[in-house]
From Swiss-Prot:
Keywords: ATP-binding, Chaperone, Metal-binding, Nucleotide-binding, Zinc. ATP-dependent specificity component of the Clp protease. It directs the protease to specific substrates. Can perform chaperone functions in the absence of ClpP. Disulfide bonds: none annotated. This is ATP-dependent Clp protease ATP-binding subunit ClpX. It comes from Bradyrhizobium sp. (strain ORS 278). The gene is clpX. SUPFAM superfamilies: Glucocorticoid receptor-like (DNA-binding domain), P-loop containing nucleoside triphosphate hydrolases. Zn(2+) binds at residues 15, 18, 37, 40. CDD domains: RecA-like_ClpX. ATP binds at residues 119-126. Component of the ClpX-ClpP complex. Forms a hexameric ring that, in the presence of ATP, binds to fourteen ClpP subunits assembled into a disk-like structure with a central cavity, resembling the structure of eukaryotic proteasomes. GO terms for biological process: cell division; proteolysis involved in protein catabolic process. Residues 3-56 form the ClpX-type ZB domain.
Length: 424
């Protein structure tokens, strides 16, 4: 412990690592002859997390086991255990196959691209983004809605490989071992049952264009984008070893699956189920290739996505966990924002339940949680920077429902001061 000056200053405690005083930090933890502040503890945790992440990637000759991959996914994604297992096994097998393909073998191992099917806000994109964090391979995400056939206004399919090449710093060898996630894949379904009616440049045409790069071909990729720089030299990228993960909400697919599985009996023996009796995620579990064909995917495209993983609807309990449990949980993010004003933000358990129910009513899944919290905390975040002495803000169920204002607890008072007992 260092001391400066006379009077009260000699009793001031300082962090032994960064030198900040006890008045400059939120917490100062004492040990035998040393002190450490909360900021240094958080910095140490970040260092440890980075080391754990690198040790995961380098384990078992560079191939993380499926359980190790799934364990890291658990830190960020709540639920969806089946989808996490499918992704973990597929990624593990993908790189195991690459590491052993140079060895002599009579059996050639083909790659297994993945199709993720799940309702809006169930975690498809988050699973792919989390994989990018934990794997030391080039990774890129593409939006299928922006893709068109070559020669039409929009992005060429080859632009996906260009983005992967950019993620690999134009290292062709690394890019050829990368992962591509194509989102909104359901939006390129065939627009008509009769393919000869009109030229479908953003639907079936894109599916046809994706076939070759997903199966494996040598793509000629212009470094600066082909349409604006037609005279440049092309880079040759072999897509045989690139793993493709496609995801989509497939709105309406549940009706096709239900119609296929519906009993054809009539009269008193017929079983009549209301649509709301079965949740979308439960119906998706029974998806078959024929259902995807009826939805508008062409047979060749379905054949190149042999692994299908379905995601469940998120119930109230799962949404509450999403709000609080992941490392980057929304509640933790807003609490961190309030900490910057030296204010503690507290959510009552009933308030979290009310937020979850609102998201379910809006049918936005986990994606809608942030907008709900933003609307709840808007007035508070607007007022707080100009208020003095506020120590804690408490959010109750009534606040979420719009019948009350947040509770403000002041440092110089033992009771809770409320801006207004109820909103007008």
């Amino acid at each position: 412990m260092s001391k400066v000056g006379n009077g009260d200053a000699k009793n001031t405690l300082y962090c032994s690592f960064c030198g900040k005083s006890q008045h400059e930090v939120r917490k100062l933890i004492a040990g035998p002859t040393v002190f450490i502040c909360d900021e240094c503890v958080e910095l140490c945790m970040d260092i440890i997390r980075e080391e754990n992440k690198s040790s995961l990637v380098k384990s078992r000759d560079g191939i993380p086991t499926p359980k190790e991959i799934c364990k890291v996914l658990d830190d960020y994604v709540i639920g969806q255990n089946h989808a996490k297992k499918v992704l973990s096994v597929a990624v593990h097998n993908h790189y195991k196959r690459l590491n052993h393909q140079t060895k002599h073998s009579d059996v050639e191992l083909a790659k297994s691209n993945i199709l993720l099917i799940g309702p809006t806000g169930s975690g498809k994109t988050l699973l792919a983004q989390t994989l990018a964090r934990i794997l030391d391979v080039p990774f890129t995400m593409a939006d299928a809605t922006t893709l068109t056939e070559a020669g039409y206004v929009g992005e060429d399919v080859e632009n996906i490989i260009l983005k992967l090449l950019q993620a690999a710093d134009y290292n062709v060898e690394r890019a050829q071992r990368g992962i591509v996630y194509i989102d909104e894949i359901d939006k390129i379904s065939r627009k008509s049952d009769n393919p000869s009616i009109t030229r479908d440049v953003s639907g079936e045409g894109v599916q046809q264009a994706l076939l070759k790069i997903m199966e494996g071909t040598v793509a000629s990729v212009p470094p600066q984008g082909g349409r604006k720089h037609p005279q440049q030299e092309f880079l040759q990228v072999d897509t045989t070893n690139i793993l493709f993960i496609c995801g989509g909400a497939f709105s309406g697919l549940e009706k096709i699956i239900s119609a296929r599985g519906r009993s054809t009996s009539i009269g008193f023996a017929a079983q009549v189920l209301a649509p709301e009796d079965r949740r979308t995620g439960e119906i998706f579990r029974h998806v078959e290739p024929e259902d995807l064909l009826k939805y508008g995917l062409i047979p060749e495209f379905v054949g190149r996505l042999p692994v299908v993983a379905t995601l469940e609807d998120l119930d109230e309990n799962s949404l509450k966990k999403i709000l609080t449990e992941p490392k980057n949980a929304l509640v933790k993010q807003y609490q961190r924002l309030f900490e910057m004003e030296n204010i503690e933000l507290t959510f009552a358990d009933e308030a979290l339940g009310a937020v979850s129910r609102k998201a379910i009513e809006r049918k936005t899944g986990a994606r809608g949680l942030r907008s709900i919290l933003e609307s709840i905390l808007l007035e508070t975040m607007f007022d707080l920077p100009g208020l003095e002495g506020v120590e804690e803000v408490v959010i109750s169920r009534e606040v979420v429902e719009g019948t009350a204002r947040p509770l403000y607890i002041y440092a110089d008072r033992s009771d809770r001061a409320v801006e207004s007992s109820a909103s007008a």
